[in-house]
Amino acid sequence: MTSEYAELHCLSNFSFQRGASSARELFERASRHGYQALAITDECTLAGIVRAWQASISTGLPLIIGSEMHIENGPKAVLLVESQTGYEALCKLITVARRRARKGEYRLLREDFEPSSDGLLAIWLPDIEGDAQACLAHGRWLRERFAERLWLGVELHRGADDEQRLADLLALAQSLGIPAVASGDVHMHARGRRALQDTMTAIRHHTTVAEAGHLLFANGERHLRPLDALAEHYPDWLLAESVRIARRCTFDLKQLKYEYPHELVPKGQTPTSWLRELTERGARKRWPNGLTPATRAQVEKELALITEKKFDSYFLTVHDIVEFARSQHILCQGRGSAANSAVCYALGITELNPEKSNLLFERFISRERNEPPDIDVDFEHDRREEVIQYIFRRYGRGRAALTAVASTYHGSGAMRDVAKVLGLPPDQINALAEAFSRWSDSLPSPERLREYGFDADTPILKRVLALTGELIGFPRHLSQHPGGFVISEHPLETLVPVENAAMADRTIIQWDKDDLDLVGLLKVDILALGMLSALRRTFDLVHLHRGKRWTLADLPGDDRETYEMISRADTIGVFQIESRAQMAMLPRLRPEKFYDLVIEVAIVRPGPIQGDMVHPYLRRRNKEEAITYPPKLKSVFERTLGVPLFQEQVMEVAIIAAGYTPGEADELRRAMAAWKRHGGLEPHRERLRTGMLKNGYEADFADRIFEQIKGFGSYGFPESHAASFALLTYASCWLKCHEPAAFTCALINSWPMGFYSPDQLLQDARRHHIEIRPVDVRYSDWDCSLEPLDHPDSTRNLAIRLGLRMVRGFREDDARRIETARSKRLFSDATDLTLRAGLDARAAEALADSGALRGLIGHRHRARWEVAGVEAQRPLFNDLPSEDTQVTLPLPTVAEDLMADYATLGTTLGPHPLALLRRQLAAKRFRSSQDLLSLENDRTLSVAGLVIGRQRPGTASGVTFVTLEDEFGMVNVVVWRDLAERQRKVLVGSQLLQVFGRLESKSGVRHLIAQRLYDLTPLLTGLDVRSRDFQ
């Protein structure tokens, strides 16, 4: 009879470059072999334990939670969780070991163990080949700590000395009075993963497989072996002992009890009463004329459900964070599903008035869905750290931490790691990387490999690609989530291990953001949004120069001039609708009101595009197609002309037409979002179809709805999310239209952000007749600023003065000292500037080269001469007479100034580079962007321009969109996949690009369909012009 067995020492791929199999693969194989349980014991981490728990549930095979540990100057052991007490003890041990070491490492000391270590079982893995006395000492120390909860692990892997090793281990166990147990040191689910495991070992140790030597296992026996194979190596009683240990380990992750912090509640209040009071206060501000009956009913419904689900403290915490931001003059706005909530609006978390929208609260919280809400709040991108540190101060690092993201291997990165350890030279690795797609994880086809000069049948290449395919999708390391916070009433280390983040002053839990819902932890996302920084700076500038303090809430709505500007696609620099695809859509959709912007934000997304929703909507909007939908679904489809554009509409259709409950509809939403990655949508096909047919809907309508639903698997927008973003879109457009100087100035001061570089933003401002003044130490602060025009008109009475931040390599500290010194008296010459502002030679030379000393000293050549040799500290020589030898230096040429501008500032206020080349280009019959406005459709022609952006959306079937800029404006170029592949080097490498192609002009949108590309970069003669590619 084959013995029963439980594997107590097994590493998954969440051991990061050790285990060569996923938890799912391990549990499926162990279940197939008839194991009684499986322990996942990744080294000093529980990063993969939630996924292991899910794999355990799906297979029915019990999970034992544990971790392999190396104690500094001590033994190696596997710690297994017996009870909740033991789980908390293990989390604390991992936390303390990780927190005292730098990221990616740990240091576990003997003194970290509690005297009793209750709830933890230990399997000692002795080094019997090493120092015998040290080995005995390790065993005695463990026996003192764990007593009857300690075993000696016997691990045999078909070595030549297995028989002797078994005898020695059993003798050691007997001499110390420690029972023995069989374990496998499993690193893979099947022997076939040995090559991958060897590869990962070499990657981890920064060596090649050929040179890894003893670092590699001697054979492939560290896999989940069948029971009969185990019985050949181990005595039955050793195998049976593993099952007895497994039966002691009864802890399950569902036993975790998570509580949100309570300290935000004043004395005499409960979380429920305090949330209601804050909501009522906010409601009086939001609705000064009182709530309508419908809104009052919605608020009451939400408060009741929040209390029922015990989420009161969560809402109070988010409110507290938002209130802190506002007290610090940090602009913020909630978005996503939280925008469905009237309570969130009343609390000031979101800005979307539910009375003016038709949003679905069940998208946010559902009685039937046993999971927490997810509130995302955007903050100014350059001030978010203040909010993050406030949370750490408010709750302490023991109770607040950021969530992790399990960064996984992707195609090119996986190949590079594999190829390197297999010994390929760097030039071949770089060339092979070119054959990998930037936009998918699929391996290159043999045809593509041949295009890049590789023989697809070469054994080494086949091996590289095979191992790369296995490695893709494996966890590579834990990184920090952009802003997802977990905050707890009790120390987080009792729930999950905490470790140091790569960034200073930050800590992260070991669980991925996707794990949190499964174990019931609530997360609040503290996200960064550059446009909020730009809007707040714009509001400040307008207040400074106009005396008017605007807010997001009180900007004039439905402004005709703003919508006319939007419909012309005059949207460079604004939020969301500045991309190449959005600007092409705007003249076709021609937004006239806020809800049109909501649709515009949502419609240029992979979901609606792949669900074939864009063209039907446009045809119906332009009265080219009849608007049809079942009368019962009028409330769902009327606002989008019968075309489902939002996730909420799909949920409403499922509820009304197919009989889904709100909770079931939310499950459908989740399936929509994840079906391409995890499947799970097909079961809904029949459910939807049957329900819709039963309720009298046509079969073709049901089928069409399902196909559109599948499109949402490619990032369809929730309406609440689109509406939140549309608020910022409108605000940025209104400011661009009515306060263009302030808006452009704020954008540059908030950079890096958005789609365009400062140079492109300034070129656009100049095309809008905004005066741009150069960097000048007599007037410039660190930030760009606004100055009155000498002869102001009624509308454009402010100019932009470029700030010292524009000077490449110039430090903010130096700029602040210039501001301070200048406030006392004006600078008289270079020596006065350098001495009083404490500038070193490098800083003074940067100012001279950039032209910032032109007003003080003269042109660049003169300024460079003047600052040469001037030092910041010359106290011994201050009173000595100086010899001032005047040197006559030639003025820079226009071309020299242009090159120096781009080299030092990244922009120019002189002529556009293309203006200097226009005569040369015109002689070759090149057209300008201005010419294209009057040329007829289908004309073939050539244009040339600076490449300011390249995009290749995932929904574009390999099409690359290129934006060129000349002295008059921009040209949009479409490069089909075959041409992009043939001329990849020219397409990706050119700064100045010539395109020969066919002009396509439809509905006010003009593109040039490329037929041939030419690199004209040599004509720029070293000009440093940088594009913003694939943003």
Swiss-Prot record:
Catalyzed chemical reaction(s): DNA(n) + a 2'-deoxyribonucleoside 5'-triphosphate = DNA(n+1) + diphosphate
Coiled coil start-end: none
Any one GO molecular-function label of the UniProt entry: DNA-directed DNA polymerase activity
Keywords associated with the record: Cytoplasm, DNA damage, DNA repair, DNA replication, DNA-directed DNA polymerase, Nucleotidyltransferase, Transferase
The protein's Enzyme Commission number: 2.7.7.7
The keyword Nucleotidyltransferase is assigned to this record: yes
GO cellular component, as recorded: cytoplasm
GO biological process, one term: DNA repair
SUPFAM superfamilies reported in the protein's UniProt record: PHP domain-like
Enzyme kind, highest EC tier: transferase
Subcellular location: Cytoplasm
Family note: Belongs to the DNA polymerase type-C family. DnaE2 subfamily.
Function in brief: DNA polymerase involved in damage-induced mutagenesis and translesion synthesis (TLS). It is not the major replicative DNA polymerase.
Stated name of the protein: Error-prone DNA polymerase
Species of the source: Pseudomonas savastanoi pv. phaseolicola (strain 1448A / Race 6) (Pseudomonas syringae pv. phaseolicola (strain 1448A / Race 6))
